[in-house]
Amino acid sequence: MIHIYTLHFKNDYWVDLQVESFKKHIKVPYKSYAIFSHMSSDIYEKRKDYYDYFEVREKGRHIHKGGNYHPTDGNRHIFPVIKQNLKPGDIVIRIDSDAFFIDDITDEFVNKVQDKKFIAIHEPQHEWDLNYRAPHPAFYAFRGEYLNQGLDSAMGEMSEDGHSNWWGLLIKWFKESNVDWYALERSNKVNLHALYFGIYDNLVYHHYAGSRDRITRVDRKKATELNVELTEIMEENHMIDKDVREQLSH
């Protein structure tokens, strides 16, 4: 059994694409869990039956993207629910709102998670230091038993990792638990942007610009190197984003 969780924040733009990818590509039994935050009651009513478990949370411990609900808040709130449903051999997937599957999730993938213990997207361009190896939280897949071995706490609180990321406790948990996470590497044949619009191991697509300002660390580096305004780069990213969204909607 797969327990797959997502947090949708401020808009429901990606729900249909994501849920359809679950239905199309997950070839093993699964339960879907979602937390929605900072949207209208009409959206909540519309989307509540799209998942096996649906919850609304408007306030967490941390400010994030102009709202008072952070991904760690979502993890902390949903993991107790998932733990109630866990059985031996189950795996858990945490997937960003603007990420979805483009290939099948089969027993082979479940076995791979059991073998590798913890699988995550690896995106060096997300980091200031391109040599720093960090698991990006857009996609995590791990043994369900780890939620009873401290992983729930490690993913449920913000902590600096020394590289301006908030998943420091997860990095610490890896070391303490002797878990060497397995990376899904970027596999794009065409890169419209160094970070955005990523495909990983030909399995997962992550848009990156789904619910945030279209400026990343790589864009800030680019602005400095080219001596151009960030607003110029943001506008360029916005136009590419608009085109990609139009293509995804067809």
Predicted regions and their residues:
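A conserved hydrophobic helix/loop-capping motif in glycosyltransferases and polysaccharide synthases
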Residues: 3-11
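Phosphate/oxyanion-binding active-site loops and adjacent basic polyanion-contact surfaces
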Residues: 11-15, 67-75, 162-163
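Short, acidic, metal-binding catalytic loop of nucleotide-sugar glycosyltransferases
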Residues: 20-30
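Short, aromatic/basic amphipathic alpha-helical patches
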Residues: 22, 42-51, 169-174
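Active-site-proximal specificity loops/subdomain of glycosyltransferases
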Residues: 35-88
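Short beta-strand-to-loop acidic/aromatic patch adjacent to the donor-nucleotide binding site
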Residues: 89-100
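Conserved catalytic core of nucleotide-sugar-dependent glycosyltransferases
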Residues: 100-172
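C-terminal catalytic/acceptor-binding lobe
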Residues: 164-250
